[in-house]
A protein has these predicted regions:
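N-terminal leader segment of winged-helix/HTH proteins
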Residues: 1-30
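Short alpha-helical elements of helix-turn-helix
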Residues: 6-10, 30-41, 52, 63
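Amphipathic alpha-helical interaction segments
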Residues: 10, 14, 38, 127-130
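Short, locally clustered residues in the helix-turn-helix/winged-helix DNA-binding domain
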Residues: 16, 41-45, 59, 106, ...
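Charged, amphipathic alpha-helical coiled-coil/dimerization segments
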Residues: 20, 48, 52, 70-133, ...
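The alpha-helix within a helix-turn-helix
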Residues: 55
């Protein structure tokens, strides 16, 4: 039988759990969690994603996205705007307040990532990022 600690699927799941826990910890004082941070990050990007695109990119159920978007919108951090390419759907964009909070949150997440990956050299971090991107996308 294979040793669980050497199975790639288990290692990726464990790394995700550890990373999410670290992100949630540093985002607590901003009243964000990893998932709401991810939505805010995409809303602050130039992509202007629809809720469906958010769900696909984040591998979440549509109802989970609605709850996340509603929560961020209630806080004045994002807003729904009609999609100029499809009036039947909305794009999700950040507000100025959302942009400011995202900048603060992004800094906290970057520092947490650096701490979590401190055992790796910068070259190893770049290699890890590249490999994970290939697997994820």
């Amino acid at each position: 039988s294979a040793d669980l600690a050497t199975e790639i699927e288990f290692l990726m799941a464990r790394a995700r759990a550890v990373g999410t826990a670290h992100a949630n910890q540093v985002l607590t004082e901003l009243e964000l969690k990893a998932r709401s941070y991810a939505v805010l990050s995409l809303a602050a990007s130039a992509a202007k994603p629809t809720q469906r695109e958010l769900a696909e990119f984040l591998s979440l159920d549509a109802s989970q996205i609605v709850a996340l978007v509603d929560g961020l919108q209630d806080r004045g951090l994002i807003r729904r705007e009609p999609d100029p390419n499809d009036r039947r759907s909305n794009v999700i964009v950040s507000t100025p307040e959302g942009d400011e909070l995202y900048a603060r949150a992004s800094d906290k997440v970057a520092r947490a990532e650096a701490a979590s990956l401190s055992a790796l050299s910068l070259e190893e971090r770049d290699q890890l990022r590249s490999l994970l991107s290939r697997v994820a996308f």
